[in-house]
């Protein structure tokens, strides 16, 4: 069980060289008092998703290893990663399409959007079989499988932006987008503002 106060001691004791993180972990560790163990570890890098852009470089500079932002789903059978320097640490970037994976960003009518616009991330394998390497389907739910694969692309449910250089930038889960006065507001953006306040220990 994760404990911010014991975490570095556990990392040092196990001689871990790679760690996995969720977005809630970096602020919890940064809020801990400086301890000698946090610089006695052998960690080469961390991989995960959801580190707040304002904390990304701060974490790396304090603890001495990079946090590699990745994206993946059980259904896709592969990941994307922002693992090539210079990494885009202040943007929620998680990499460019690679490894035979094609990606595009669409609106609610599945129309492809221009670069830089927020929309749902769709992915598929580049080749005669777009489902190659993906899951075979949702258990006993062929309707949900067909809906996810409509138009020959897998609908991830993630809202992203694809930049002119092909970099994909995470915004939020589609179900977490708040509609207000005609605007799409990512819940993660509001949570980031709250998390930055010194009186807030954790945001859920």
Residue ranges and their predicted role:
Residues 5-22, 30-90, 102-104, 109-112:
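Gly/Ser/Thr-rich phosphate-binding loop
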Residues 11-12, 19-22, 109, 123, ...:
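AMP-binding/adenylate-forming catalytic core of the ANL superfamily
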Residues 27, 53, 57, 92, ...:
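Active-site phosphate/pyrophosphate- and oxyanion-stabilizing loops and adjacent acidic/basic residues
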Residues 42, 64, 100, 144, ...:
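Glycine-centered tight turns that cap/initiate beta-strands
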Residues 50-53, 82, 89-140, 148:
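Adenylate-forming AMP-binding core of the ANL superfamily, especially NRPS adenylation
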Residues 72, 95, 158, 182:
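Active-site glycine-centered loops adjacent to acidic/histidine catalytic or metal-binding residues
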């Amino acid at each position: 069980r994760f404990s911010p106060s014991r975490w570095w001691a556990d990392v040092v004791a196990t001689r871990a060289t790679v760690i996995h993180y969720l977005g809630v972990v970096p602020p919890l560790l940064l809020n801990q008092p400086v301890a000698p163990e946090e610089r006695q570890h052998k960690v080469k890098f961390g991989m995960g998703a959801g580190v707040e852009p304002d904390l990304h470089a701060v974490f790396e500079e304090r603890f001495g290893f990079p946090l590699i932002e990745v994206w993946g789903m059980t259904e896709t059978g592969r990941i994307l990663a922002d693992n090539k320097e210079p990494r885009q640490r202040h943007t929620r970037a998680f990499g460019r399409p690679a490894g035979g994976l094609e990606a595009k960003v669409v609106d609610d009518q599945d129309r492809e959007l221009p670069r830089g616009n927020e929309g749902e991330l769709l992915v598929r394998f580049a080749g005669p079989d777009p489902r190659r390497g993906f899951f075979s389907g949702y258990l006993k739910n062929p309707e949900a499988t067909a809906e996810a694969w409509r138009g020959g692309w897998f609908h991830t449910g993630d809202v992203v932006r694809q930049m002119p250089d092909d970099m994909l930038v995470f915004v939020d889960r589609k179900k977490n987008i708040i509609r207000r006065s005609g605007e799409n507001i990512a819940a993660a953006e509001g949570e980031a503002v709250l998390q930055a306040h010194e009186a807030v220990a954790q945001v859920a």
